[in-house]
Amino acid sequence: LSHKASWRFLRIVKMRTITILLFFGAFLLSALKAEGDTIRYQLLWNSMTATTGNSPFWFQNNRYGTVPFDATNTNLFATIRKDKSANDKLFDYNFVASGYVGISNKQSALYLHELYLNARLWVFNASVGMREEFQGTQDETLSSGGLLFSQNARPMPKVFIGIEDFTPLFFKNKMLEVKGGMYNGWFTDQVYTQNLLFHHKFAYLRVGGIHSPIHLQYGLEHAAQWGGIVPGEYGQQPIGFTDFINVFRARGGSSAATLFEQINVGGNHIMSQSAKVELKLSKYDIKAYWQNISEDQPVDFLWNSVNVADGLWGITVQNKAFPFIQKVLYEYLNTTDQSGPFHDMDGVVYGGNDSYFNNYLYQNGWTHYGRTIGTPFITSPIYNKNKEIGILNNRVQVHHIGVEGYYHEYNYRILSSFTKNYGTYSDYPNETLRTSTNMLLEVNKHFEKIWNVDIGIQVGLDAGSMYGNNTGFALKISKKGILFHIK
């Protein structure tokens, strides 16, 4: 397709997306009147300060890009939502609309954070919009973040079709469960590449059953950046339907793509696989998981991967009888191997120096608004002092510990991470080792007699040569409740 025809195709896709959103919006209003639903609200005030020029590591990372880089900042959030129904209905839907005012030393601005509508018919889901998503096998509250997808970057507008939650297949006792689907969307930051497109699909299998104490889980993920207008000689990248099929199949680009894209694959592709084991005992729940990524080669099953030394390994132990220490987590992250230091391995085979989250064509890499979409320990460009837009530190080793629990009416969370940072293979073999210790203590309490609010305090600490020495304090006040109920 010509560039003009390709843009016509993209405009048609966007218009159809808007049409679907409007259709669901109209349906939502009729559903509210017909069935009756509870609409909830939340107001949140979050303010922090720190001893250096930026906020501590765990203050600003894995926060969906909502916390500014600056040391002193305040966010005022407002959210309206309708949650998923508790009962298993044939049809269900949920939506969220949220925004915030961000105030810092450098700027103040109004941000639209989430705006999406999700509908489910039987086991199938369809959603449109921007939403906070949790993807992967890692722990949701204590993890350092998934390897390919974490909670680090701002949501982007996407369309999803698929089976969102694990669904029994053939067996009534849930012996075999599956989930999977496909996302397509747009990067909205426009940092380097204009109108960059997003593609992501996944498939997971879980074996065990409701009567078994052991569950095994395995999943595959494929994500890609494609299309867009690249500055300089490369210019407009192809975005026709044939190009989308090539991206979907991870095949070489069309004749309109760059020569390297034609030889390799069209776009920037990252594959991931993960495995998880869950063990349920009388007093404990134990979960162990592993994640790996592949940047320029097909995924090899588990231990056959060329970069098998790289990955995220984690284990959690949940205590059912002692709430003071309710859950403990340990994770080890390694990304130093990257299939070796040389892309030209032997003059025939090419595949080393994977340089995770970087790409020669899309130089902003696997990021959105200056933050990595995957693990935050592959350092986000927002930390780059020279204002470069790419990843300057993607060879890391991390030991991460998390603990959470309750004491009377207080709940707490502790994160502690120790990292070794080696930069990228472009620094090899003269790389400079930089270390860092990053800690977070968070305590929250619900005050029913004080306007029914939740108050939380946080203390963050950074120490070392990677992110510097820094101490921060944060205060959070939130109030949530029922906005209205339609019978």
Set out the residue ranges of the language-model regions.
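Residues on the lipid-exposed face of transmembrane beta-strands in outer-membrane beta-barrel proteins
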Residues: 76-84, 115-119, 128, 159-165, ...
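Transmembrane beta-strand segments of Gram-negative outer membrane beta-barrel proteins
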Residues: 35-76, 86-97, 178-184, 455
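Outer-membrane beta-barrel pore domains
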Residues: 260-272, 280-487
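Bacterial Sec-dependent N-terminal signal peptides
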Residues: 1-39, 477, 483-487
